[in-house]
Amino acid sequence: LCLLTPFIHFKNTPNGVFLLHFNTMKLLSKLSLPFIFFTALLTLECAAQDWPNLNRYREANKAIMEMRKNDSEDARKNWVVFMGNSITQNWASLDPQFFSENDYIGRGISGQTSSQMLLRFRQDVIHLAPKAVVILAGTNDIAGNTGPTSIDMIMDNIKSMTELAQANQIKVVLCSVLPANRYGWSPEVQPADTIIALNELIKDYARSKRLVYVDFYTALVDEQKGLNPNYGRDSVHPNLDGYKVMEPLVVKGIKRALSRP
């Protein structure tokens, strides 16, 4: 339905919004009143969409909190939430036993950028009161999924999620962005060097704040600065073998984070 309403397809700049709105009004001026009314209703419906996808885990979060409300502090000692995008979502789907056996909670949403993760961080992480959070974010930002961005903007979102976690006594594990030298859905983007630069910023920030940094990149990269084909079904997403490489790395990182005062 949203494809029928050009009004909502805007660029994240004031000029872009104005131009698209102007062109739409010129078009609608030539159309019948019923069509204009119908289009307006569609526009309102699209505008009301859940951009950060807060609804994705809302019921699951309620169920977890209800189920665990009487758990002791000792029973909560290993609760860990994984915040991320499709890489995290697929992880929980391809190897659910890894999550269930370790008391890990997957909160990945396909296609999400760090801006969207930040908006749902309170609901999908803080309200669950985990002992630690694993943050894996950035590749969809670089792909431009929610508009133009920079590695500094991505870092601002990662820093904000970190600060929210720490303010609520949640340990933080920051992860490198996985290697990728192309995005099938954004072929015009050349991400390899940007990912390397972003990972350096994440690593430096983790060091400066005495946080745990987990380096997935080095373990998964190939000679072309992309995802090793042995570990991924495409240029971005790990397969089960890839996740099996990642798992001991993140477990070690979580243990280090939980052992710190």
Q: How would you describe each model-predicted region?
A:
Residues T24-P34:
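Bacterial N-terminal signal peptides that target proteins for export
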Residues P96-D103, L118-P261:
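Alpha-helical cap/lid subdomain in secreted, periplasmic
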Residues P34-T43:
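Bacterial N-terminal signal peptides
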Residues P6, N12-F18:
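N-terminal amphipathic/hydrophobic targeting modules at extreme N-termini
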Residues A47-A132:
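Serine-esterase "nucleophile elbow" of acetyl-processing enzymes
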Residues F7-I8, D124:
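Hydrophobic residues within membrane-embedded alpha helices
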